Every structure is written in C-alpha cells, then in structure tokens.
Amino acid sequence: VQVSPNTITGGDNGSGYSDEHKTIEGFAFTQMSGVGWFGDLGNFLVMPTTGKLQKIAGKEDGSIKGYRSAYDKATEIAKAGYYSVELTDYKIKVESSATPHCGILQFTFPSSEQSRIQIDLARRVGGTSTSQYVKVLDDHTIQGWMKCTPDGGGWGNGEGNSDYTVYYYAQFSKPLSNYGFWSADIPDDWVRKRDEVVSIPYLTRVSQAPVIKDKKE
C-alpha cells in the first residue's frame, strides 16, 4: 500500500505526485515506484469535496473543470509514514498514512451541508481500469474490485501488458447516510488509454452519467 496525492491521470506520472502541478485530483492507494514508461497503478482514488457534485476530476491545466482542487504548498507536511495538506478549493485538511496492509485517510471538513467523499474506481495512471465492482456491506463499509488490462492503457500505454486486479475493503468512520454510484456508457469501439481517457468526448460521457441511488451494488 502506498497512499499518495495524485496530480494527473494522463501522461507519465507513476509516482502519482508531481511538484510542478498546482492541483490534486485525489489520493490513491497504489503507486508504481522506480519505473517510467507512462506509469500505472494509482488505483482507488479518494477525494473529499464540498458543494455541487462534480463527476470528473477535470484537467490539470484547468481547461476542463472538475472536482480536483488547488492546494496550499505551505501547509504540506511530508515525512516517513505521514502526509498532510490543505485543499484550498474546499478548505479541507487531508491527512494520510499507511500500514503494511492498509491505507488511512482522515479528512477535516469545514461546516457544510454538502460534504462528501468521492471514490473513482475507474481511475488509473496512464489509462483506466476496464471493469469495476462495488458492494455496500453496511452503513460503514464497502468492498469490491477493479480489473486493469492492457486495453485500459497503463504501463507503456498498454504495451507493457500490465494485467492485474485490485481488491479493496473500505471502512468509514461516519455512516453512509446518502450515497450513489455512476457508471458511464463508453462505446465498445472507443480506445480507453492514456490520452483518450482525458479527451473531451470521454470526459463528457463520464460527466453526463446518471447517479444511481438506493442500490447496494
């Protein structure tokens, strides 16, 4: 487990975080260390937000808006086993740590009637997972998996033949009083790799996906 802020999905950013980027799109629980070639992993992206629901992260250059947030570098604390930062767009303090088998995120929200935690199961550095599953076990717990294949890009933009499944089990300190899912209808003939998943047509499809409520999986 490597919990890290992630700043960009497309491109070569296997470590997740790049100092020159001015925004954070979420905090992922897996990172590819020590290798380039367009990167991979960056799975189970978690982002705390407030205000109107945004279904896409948007683009790092600001050309497409989304739930990503600017952050205050003066508030960053990074040391072995701990990282924290303030997301200035939401005024949320994020703290993260990890154990050998799990990652921990703590969010300190401002007073708001529209506070939420968003989880992107499709997100993957340099591409996307090709199938996902989530099940709500109780009002504090979800579990499921994400399947990543070369068809979804990743290492070498698919040429590295990276093929893996990430299984997750997540517990929340507060009950899930109001939740929903959304799944975009992506045509079978669309390429789903590094550049395509951050293209305007692809992001438009995801942003227009309906929110499904009152279902457990």
Question: What is the meaning of each model-derived region?
Answer:
Residues 1-217:
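Accessory carbohydrate-recognition regions in carbohydrate-active enzymes
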